[in-house]
From Swiss-Prot:
It comes from Legionella pneumophila (strain Corby). The lineage of its organism: Bacteria, Pseudomonadati, Pseudomonadota, Gammaproteobacteria, Legionellales. Disulfide bonds: none annotated. Binds 1 potassium ion per subunit. GO terms for molecular function: GTP binding; GTPase activity; metal ion binding. It is found in: Cytoplasm. It holds the Pfam family MMR_HSR1. InterPro entries: G_TrmE, GTP-bd, GTP-bd_TrmE_N, GTPase_MnmE, MnmE_dom2, MnmE_helical, P-loop_NTPase, Small_GTP-bd. This is tRNA modification GTPase MnmE. Mg(2+) binds at S229, T250.
Length: 446
């Protein structure tokens, strides 16, 4: 690990009442003395100081806080300077700190040092960035839960059960002369099944956290004049798409971002799907299919007065799109009929024009993508889901080895690999490439 002393501005760019410069590393205290004219600092106390340039010219006044390692965020000596929030003043403080022996921090390097010094685990480090970037109050609360260790505790408890099972299995392999066949006495099978069930429960909770963090890509598709643009306008609560009676009005991709019960919803309106000789419209249709293949969920909007549109297009979507992408059929323009709004598992009847049935649509979207907020919810990332899925696959393989082949050695190896995979979530076992990828996405100064 680097023993450089690092410095960065910890507050957002721009002018403000207060700006914070953060310094961390073995020379942090000495650099602070260079900046404040050798005024002694007491740990965990704020000291009002004049702040000087190298020629002893005062450049500002502010508070200087000293956190002596290891009792600091990074585990190192940390200095935080609270100066006036002028970009010029803050830049001068950075330059003076570098002149005194610091270097500019990389994005996320303060959090990386906290992780490497065992102040936080990898889940908590990611939660810092997620809390900063939270798009709703629920997402912020869930990120805080992850930062406080809720998600980490679940993974650590799962690992403890897995370690116990590994010890049990490996003892049975190492002492085959024992009268009791530990591998086949039922305990191993029961313990393994319990761990798989617990993993599935955590995976379900993590999936809710991913939805809250990353949101949902919702693509609106249909024939021309089915009411797609009217629907996106109604969902957005404002006019974001041009609506006319002329078929083919929407030719390019239209994007809008809203919150659906705290889920970030990335709505994409597309050109009407049909055969066309118009070069511009053909390009719009091509882009529509590209967006459909990347969607998390598709709304197929059908003019209820032309229900035959639905069958051919729905079949085409099912043949073209991956099976994992759910399709909700939206029968629009019920205001032109005697029908009222209603819904079932994958079908909604509504009027995009009047808004009748919009609540039913939102309900179906949440059901289809599996959003079920729970008390123990926490924020998570896709890499966590991938690791949980990989660990489950290994455990199921091990279960098969035990049940079908009585292969204790193969089961032990699958348990070891599953344990290693779960340790990657918290960072107990990880690679430099993964750390670089995670921390490089952080703000400088965090």
């Amino acid at each position: 690990m680097s023993i450089d002393t690092i410095v960065a501005i910890a507050t957002p760019p721009g002018r403000g009442g207060v700006g914070i410069v953060r310094i961390s590393g073995p020379n942090a205290y000495a650099i602070a003395l260079c900046l404040n004219g050798n005024k002694a600092l007491q740990p965990r106390l704020a000291t009002f100081c004049s702040l000087y340039k190298g020629n002893n010219e005062v450049l500002d006044q502010g508070l200087v806080l000293y956190f002596k390692g290891p009792h600091s965020f990074t585990g190192e000596d940390v200095i935080e300077i609270q100066a006036h929030g002028s970009p010029v003043v803050l830049d001068l403080l950075i330059k003076e700190s570098i002149a005194a022996g610091a270097r500019l921090a990389r994005p996320g390097e303060f959090s990386e040092r906290a992780f490497l010094n065992d102040k936080i685990d990898l889940i908590q480090a990611e939660a810092i960035a997620d809390l900063i970037q939270a798009s709703s109050d629920t997402a912020a609360r869930m990120a805080l839960k992850s930062l406080q260790g809720d998600f980490s505790k679940k993974i650590n408890q799962l690992n403890e059960e897995l370690i116990y099972l590994r010890m049990y299995v490996e003892a049975a392999i190492d002492f085959p002369e024992e009268e009791i066949d530990f591998l086949n006495d039922g305990n191993v099978s029961q313990l393994l099944q319990r761990i798989i069930g617990r993993l599935e429960e955590i995976r379900s909770q993590a999936n809710q956290g991913v939805l809250l963090r990353e949101g949902l890509s919702l693509v609106i598709a249909g024939r021309p004049n089915a009411g797609k643009s009217t629907l996106i306008n109604n969902l957005a609560g404002r006019d974001v798409a041009i609506v006319t009676e002329i078929a083919g009005t929407t030719r390019d991709i239209m994007r809008e971002h809203i919150l659906l019960d705290d889920i970030p919803l990335h709505i994409i309106d597309t050109a009407g799907l049909r055969d066309s000789d118009d070069l511009v419209e053909k390009e719009g249709i091509k882009r529509a299919w590209q967006e459909l293949k990347r969607a998390d969920c598709v709304l197929l909007v059908v003019d209820i007065n032309n229900p035959d549109q639905q069958n051919s297009l729905l079949n085409e979507l099912r043949l073209t799109l991956p099976n994992k992408i759910p399709i909700i059929t939206v029968y629009n323009k019920i205001d032109t009929t005697k029908l009222t709004a209603k819904c079932d598992e994958h079908t909604v009847y509504l009027s995009a024009k009047t808004g009748e049935g919009l609540d039913e649509l939102k309900k179906v979207i949440k059901q289809v993508v599996g959003y079920q907020p729970t008390e123990g919810q926490f924020l998570a990332r896709r890499r966590h889901l991938q690791a949980l899925d990989e660990a489950k696959a290994l455990l199921l393989t091990g279960q098969s080895q035990l049940t079908n082949h009585k292969a204790g050695e193969l089961l032990a190896e699958d348990l070891r690999l599953a344990h290693q995979t779960l340790c990657e979530i918290t960072g107990e076992f990880t690679s430099d490439d993964l750390l670089g990828k995670i921390f490089s996405s952080f703000c400088i100064g965090k």
